[in-house]
């Protein structure tokens, strides 16, 4: 059973029959009465006391005795002023008598005369008062409407603002099981072991083992961390509390720490249990140092409370915290130490075998045509996460439905892969004839250089059909999973990326802006070879990694440069030399295989897409096989003097995408 936690004191239920509720209109009487009173108060303010009230005869008598000093005549006949001794008075001048004769008499007696223009009418005063209170009325109505929609008014929700927004699963659990999580056998074993700790604690206590306090799952987005938590909730025989890290953040100070306390109080009531915190980096970021100018006291208070609850003076017994994040580098070290998060489980991008298993799970309720080989689809999608594979199957199903078929074909999966990587395809006729020829030459250059390079990934397909910003694409697929990249492989990769530009220079006589994406990716790879991988003889075996997220590519932290300006100049020179050497190698391959490039460009103009086997036939080389790849890989790894980029691939821990190169549309 799933319910929302808003813990508090239990309320006694009435035993007798409750009186009937008042009619709805009565609850509006008091607010309307107060509003009318305020309107009248501000519309008709009390006039100050006007002193002694005189009749018109008494006023004339005082005027003749020179007792009147000033007079102010109103448009409605009312008059007020001061006596000679300064006392105020008021009187009413009859209509028709406040003429020139009275004015002459007032002037003859030395009275200072003033007049007041007519004021607004009663209706206009009431209207002005209502309009002045209209914003207040609208705001009051908005609060009333929101309160009715939420089941309680704004003020009614304030007492529970410090309560944790956690969902508790006790009896009715999610339908997800570990069998629904394909692949990741090691990760599932670690997570299942924690569940077994809580199911059978005595077995571990007899061996002297302590139950881990926390398990942190880290990995790129879309790899199934939250899915793994849902599987734990479905498999666990203990209560499961689920909450997101952002739910602790609120506009009121102290609310985050209060919600952490309330969450663990609720967890202790259900112990033994599991607390799952998704996106824990929202509250677990590293605290500011002593000299830091910018700090977030509210977030740090929330983090401090979380640290105390997990392993403080009174730690939570029988409560295991399961958390997930794709930004482990920003978490506070105190949160990651043993005793809080005893285990860190990495959920990486799936391997080829894992991708095949994930595809089989998502294809359970779909009909596949005989030509569909899910192992081949898995090999064609290196670097895809579990979420992207689910999207791949869904896009293939959409393509089949669009064509009026129930069975998913291999072409549907190829279309879905291209759409995810590149975007929606366009017709090549959108290009000018000269542009279409330039794109064909460009892609032919990529394909021929890749086919003639010993260490490059094999060419799978070449196309000049525009998709997204790409005007053409050369697809390369590795024959096996790569975990280390040798220097020879990286240098051949540079030559392949610059092969399109080299073909333009050799055949067309000039380069174009279509190579901008190739230049960008080649420069980035060369920079990492020199600065991070230690593959520069001039710079030596040093590594200056660029700060940024481990699993979120694209962002870079503003960190101080750990080397001198002279070192930066050497890095720039080495990068330029690597790129020049790669371009010269690519141009040499194009010159030696000019006929193959011309024939492939003609085939692309005619067919728009050419299979990789045709490319190898044109250059006179056999299509690479997995056995040849394994022999070559073993030969390159054992070769002396060849350095490998250890610890991470050239994509920062993830496999490269299948689209090796593309023309960019500017």
Curated annotation (Swiss-Prot):
It is a multi-pass membrane protein. Keywords: ATP-binding, Cell membrane, Hydrolase, Membrane, Metal-binding, Metalloprotease, Nucleotide-binding, Protease, Transmembrane, Transmembrane helix, Zinc. GO terms for molecular function: ATP binding; ATP hydrolysis activity; ATP-dependent peptidase activity; metalloendopeptidase activity; zinc ion binding. Residues 641-653 have a biased composition (Low complexity). Coiled coil: none annotated. Zn(2+) binds at residues 442, 446, 518. Its cofactor is Zn(2+). It is found in: Cell membrane. SUPFAM superfamilies: FtsH protease domain-like, P-loop containing nucleoside triphosphate hydrolases. It is an enzyme of class 3 (hydrolase). GO terms for cellular component: plasma membrane. Binds 1 zinc ion per subunit. The active site is at residue 443. Residues 1-23, 626-666 are annotated as: Disordered. Residues 1-27, 147-666 are cytoplasmic. Its EC number is 3.4.24.-. Residues 49-125 are extracellular. InterPro entries: AAA+_ATPase (IPR003593), AAA_lid_3 (IPR041569), ATPase_AAA_core (IPR003959), ATPase_AAA_CS (IPR003960), FtsH (IPR005936), P-loop_NTPase (IPR027417), Pept_M41_FtsH_extracell (IPR011546), Peptidase_M41 (IPR000642). The chain crosses the membrane at residues 28-48, 126-146. One of its GO terms (biological process) is protein catabolic process. In the central section; belongs to the AAA ATPase family. In the C-terminal section; belongs to the peptidase M41 family. Acts as a processive, ATP-dependent zinc metallopeptidase for both cytoplasmic and membrane proteins. Plays a role in the quality control of integral membrane proteins. Homohexamer. This is ATP-dependent zinc metalloprotease FtsH. It comes from Acidothermus cellulolyticus (strain ATCC 43068 / DSM 8971 / 11B).
